[in-house]
Amino acid sequence: MNSMRFSLLDRTTQNSVISTTSNDLSNWSRLSSLWPLLYGTSCCFIEFASLIGSRFDFDRYGLVPRSSPRQADIILTAGTVTMKMAPSLVRLYEQMPEPKYVIAMGACTITGGMFSTDSYSTVRGVDKLIPVDVYLPGCPPKPEAIIDAITKLRKKLSREIYEDRIGCQQENRCFTTNHKFRVGRSTHTGNYDQGLLYQSPSTSEIPFESFLKYKSSVSSHELVN
């Protein structure tokens, strides 16, 4: 169903572990399961209900209808959109998270249909309110046409994902430059450069008698002060 192949998903190790990026994983899951928000106001919406049956079985396409716009990827408008319902439609679209897509289903949604000639309260096309990605003409469109529209939307998503990947690869390039380092003394043995860093002798290297004389002189100096 998905015409886009993700090259990073093909990289497998000997233990059959797939290595990929989070963006490719989210895009792959979005292509496999689109969550539509059904916005039906007229008779065209009845044709979408035919997809629920066993003949077309829209579950095999990964469609999971959602009742909240904050959980939806697609808003599917079907039927006549009036001036009174226009603010509600725009508000639902604005509440959807990015990326979001719109499918205009039916002649009444696309152009206003037969109500656009003499009705003062009908919106002449839903694309005057929100951007439309797929137009689905018909009065009403058949369930086969709805499946074809979803398939075309998936191809559109695949193309956008590929273009985004190419853009990211061109923008996020890594450039290297040569730096000149001064080779100093090896620090693995603990012999630091005395000119740069002063290292006091440790107490283990001082003889025990000299150490006692040093302590007694320090203590007497403290008593005098």
From Swiss-Prot:
Its EC number is 7.1.1.-. GO terms for biological process: aerobic respiration; electron transport coupled proton transport; photosynthesis, light reaction. Keywords: 4Fe-4S, Chloroplast, Iron, Iron-sulfur, Membrane, Metal-binding, NAD, NADP, Plastid, Plastoquinone, Quinone, Thylakoid, Translocase, Transport. It is a peripheral membrane protein. InterPro entries: NADH_UbQ_OxRdtase-like_20kDa (IPR006137), NADH_UQ_OxRdtase_20Kd_su (IPR006138). GO terms for cellular component: chloroplast thylakoid membrane; respiratory chain complex I. Binds 1 [4Fe-4S] cluster. Gene3D superfamilies: 3.40.50.12280. [4Fe-4S] cluster binds at residues 43-44, 108, 139. One of its GO terms (molecular function) is NADH dehydrogenase (ubiquinone) activity. Its cofactor is [4Fe-4S] cluster. It catalyses: a plastoquinone + NADH + (n+1) H(+)(in) = a plastoquinol + NAD(+) + n H(+)(out); a plastoquinone + NADPH + (n+1) H(+)(in) = a plastoquinol + NADP(+) + n H(+)(out). It is found in: Plastid, Chloroplast thylakoid membrane. NDH is composed of at least 16 different subunits, 5 of which are encoded in the nucleus. NCBIfam families: nuoB_fam, PRK06411.1. NDH shuttles electrons from NAD(P)H:plastoquinone, via FMN and iron-sulfur (Fe-S) centers, to quinones in the photosynthetic chain and possibly in a chloroplast respiratory chain. The immediate electron acceptor for the enzyme in this species is believed to be plastoquinone. Couples the redox reaction to proton translocation, and thus conserves the redox energy in a proton gradient. Belongs to the complex I 20 kDa subunit family. HAMAP family: NDH1_NuoB. This is NAD(P)H-quinone oxidoreductase subunit K, chloroplastic. It comes from Illicium oligandrum.
